[in-house]
UniProtKB/Swiss-Prot annotation:
Matching InterPro entries: Globin (IPR000971), Globin-like_sf (IPR009050), Globin/Proto (IPR012292), Hemoglobin_a-typ (IPR002338), Hemoglobin_oxygen_transport (IPR050056), Hemoglobin_pi (IPR002339)
Protein name as it appears in the record: Hemoglobin subunit alpha-2
Entry binding sites for heme b: H87
Family: Belongs to the globin family.
Record GO biological process: hydrogen peroxide catabolic process
UniProt keyword list: Heme, Iron, Metal-binding, Oxygen transport, Transport
């Protein structure tokens, strides 16, 4: 459960990330593919080379979904319902992959925003990504 302080930390961090969210999303995907090669199996039709247009496009989709979650932090299940349906019923993504991407997002954000990435912000973002992952996997049951 995100506390009021967590919600404020997440909103502040996301504001600092700002227009770079799509780039960071793409970098986190690349990081995930390199660190956890089995995750590539969900993207057989993608050019997975560094800087590919497909990774950039999907990274922006990830960032846009997270921005939507931040903007609806008090109703993430409602805001992410269609995305949850897509990942559970059509794409059938293994739920563990959300945790892997969350970790890669944390590493990417910490590397680009060290001043903003305090221990409290790190903890809040970790909880936020876990909450997003829970929502995205809620329709698997």
């Amino acid at each position: 459960v995100l506390s009021p302080a967590d919600k404020n930390n997440v909103k502040s961090a996301w504001k600092a990330i700002g227009s770079h969210a799509g780039e960071h999303g793409a970098e986190a995907l690349e990081r995930m593919f390199l660190s956890f090669p089995p995750t590539k199996t969900y993207f057989p039709h993608f050019d997975l080379s560094h800087g590919s247009a497909q990774i950039k496009t999907h990274g922006k989709k990830v960032a846009d979904a997270l921005t939507n979650a931040v903007n609806h932090i008090d109703d993430m299940p409602g805001a992410l319902s269609a995305l949850s349906d897509l990942h559970a019923h059509k794409l059938r993504v293994d739920p563990v992959n959300f945790k892997l991407l969350s970790h890669c997002l944390l590493v990417t954000l910490a590397s680009h925003h060290p001043a903003e990435f305090t221990p409290a912000v790190h903890a809040s973002l970790d909880k936020f990504f876990a909450a997003v992952s829970t929502v995205l996997t809620s329709k698997y049951r």
